[in-house]
Amino acid sequence: MATTSDLAKGVILRFNGNLHILEEISHHTPGNKRGFYQAKMRNLRNGRIVENKFRSGEAVEIVSTERRKHQYLYQDGLDYVMMDGDTYEQLHISNELIGEQAKFLKESMEVDLVFTTDGEIIQAEVPVFVELEVTETDPTTKDDRANSGTKPATMETGAIIQVPMFVQNGDFIRIDTRTGEYIERAKK
């Protein structure tokens, strides 16, 4: 069993019977007292943030995981169907595992699935940057392009994000899936 000194950001551990991913960890040594670790963790089932203090040297259960790339095929109701490129096995992933990033999923996109050693899927990660086509946005005039500002644009996946005034229908843009923000125009 691991101890608190093995904890680091991104580690998945079992806490109070649920799987959590460690978001932040810091060590504190107040005055002449024993040191402790202050941890901020995200529950992988419901997404809630949990904070806890661990004593230095306390035993914790770190979960062994395996990360595998899968190809996104299509949406089936509330589930997303992914295919393993090696075995061609198709998996149905629930909407809760992908979360807000689902709006950036495009057919044939590679998605990282995180499995426990028991074969349970605990996390699905969309690539950090994706390139999508703008399918609908307001036309701009020459005066609008001179001004700085943003306008809403609908992507090919249905996601609506704010883009600069110079972006037109048919443009390909790069988006940060963590924040849902425009990064730059893609070179296509």
Swiss-Prot record:
It comes from the Bacteria. Gene3D superfamilies: 2.30.30.30, Nucleic acid-binding proteins. Pathway: Protein biosynthesis; polypeptide chain elongation. GO terms for cellular component: cytoplasm. Signal peptide: none annotated. Transmembrane segments: none annotated. CDD domains: S1_EF-P_repeat_1, S1_EF-P_repeat_2. One of its GO terms (biological process) is peptide biosynthetic process. It holds the Pfam family Elong-fact-P_C. Keywords: Cytoplasm, Elongation factor, Protein biosynthesis. GO terms for molecular function: translation elongation factor activity. It is found in: Cytoplasm. PANTHER family: ELONGATION FACTOR P, ELONGATION FACTOR P (EF-P) FAMILY PROTEIN. HAMAP family: EF_P. Belongs to the elongation factor P family. Involved in peptide bond synthesis. Stimulates efficient translation and peptide-bond synthesis on native or reconstituted 70S ribosomes in vitro. Probably functions indirectly by altering the affinity of the ribosome for aminoacyl-tRNA, thus increasing their reactivity as acceptors for peptidyl transferase. This is Elongation factor P. It comes from Chloroherpeton thalassium (strain ATCC 35110 / GB-78). The lineage of its organism: Bacteria, Pseudomonadati, Chlorobiota, Chlorobiia, Chlorobiales.
